[in-house]
Curated annotation (Swiss-Prot):
A UniProt-annotated Pfam family: bZIP_1
Stored CDD domains: bZIP_plant_RF2 (cd14703)
Gene Ontology molecular functions: DNA binding; DNA-binding transcription factor activity
SUPFAM superfamilies listed in its UniProt record: Leucine zipper domain
Biased composition (Low complexity): 85-97
The protein, known as: Basic leucine zipper 6
Entry keyword set: DNA-binding, Nucleus, Transcription, Transcription regulation
Organism: Oryza sativa subsp. japonica (Rice)
Length: 265
């Protein structure tokens, strides 16, 4: 909160008359210019109360006079201050004296601060009133409780599912540790059987080739046997024909049919 200006001292009437006679027209012109400058500054830019008070206190000291503001009336004095003080106490501009105006400003500022504090509740008050508002709305309370229960059930289901997965993983790991040696042994046996199978395949291929050779040799032998059989039959035929001719030569001429066969042969 901005600081309020101090009360402006009020000089005695005799001192006022002495300043008016001693100051002359120069001091009066300076006071009028200062009042106009304060009014123009008031319309152009807002100043805080502390800045205005500081300016008012420094200006007379620079001029070398102690009671120059006694000549100014209440309206000119109030025009030097920004609207902050005036807005807080609108009736202070029409006060009868400087002391009364300052007191009205102070009271108005305190009442403004009290209204501001009462109009804007603090965080503690908001936190204190929030449970009451929640209790006044039973549907909202039920909805919040239902959401919390649903979230709790969901968390319980997730934890159960995770525990089941962990148990399954542990069981599978135990089975893997038990079956790993057996799998390694079977893998080694498979390698050995693969090598034996390759040897057997090579032997089967060699036997198939040998069978082909043997089949060809057997076919050649069969043809040779057939040829020898034919030769044997021819020799038997010739031998039988020669014996018959010898028998006919001994006992007489051969019969005419046999003689023709011998001629054709």
């Amino acid at each position: 909160m901005a600081q309020l200006p101090p009360k402006i001292p009020v000089a005695a009437p005799g001192h006022h008359q002495h300043w008016a006679s001693a100051g002359g027209a120069g001091d009066a012109a300076w006071a009028d210019e200062f009042a106009e400058f304060a009014a123009s500054r008031r319309g152009a830019h807002r100043r805080s109360l502390s800045d205005s008070v500081a300016f008012v206190e420094v200006a007379p000291a620079g001029c070398g006079a102690g009671g120059e503001f006694d000549r100014l009336d209440d309206d000119q004095l109030m025009s030097m201050f920004p609207d902050e003080g005036g807005s807080s106490a609108p009736g202070s501009d029409n006060g009868g004296s400087d002391s009364d105006g300052g007191g009205d400003k102070h009271a108005a500022a305190q009442s403004d601060d009290g209204q501001h504090a009462a109009g804007e509740p603090t965080q503690e008050q908001a936190a204190a009133t929030s449970p009451t508002e929640l209790i006044r709305d039973p549907k909202r309370v039920k909805r919040i409780l239902a959401n919390r229960q649903s979230a709790q059930r969901s968390r319980v289901r997730k934890l159960q599912y995770i525990s089941e997965l962990e148990r399954s993983v542990t069981t599978l790991q135990n089975e893997v540790s038990v079956l790993s040696p057996r799998v390694a042994f079977l893998d080694q046996q498979r390698t050995i059987l693969t090598v034996g199978n390759s040897h057997l395949k090579q032997r089967i291929a060699a036997l198939a080739q040998d069978k082909i050779f043997k089949d060809a040799h057997q076919e050649a032998l069969r043809k040779e046997i057939e040829r020898l059989r034919q030769v044997y039959q021819q020799q038997n035929t010739k031998l039988s024909g020669g014996l018959a001719a010898d028998h006919a030569h001994v006992h007489g001429g051969p019969p005419p049919v046999r003689a023709e066969k011998e001629l054709m042969s």
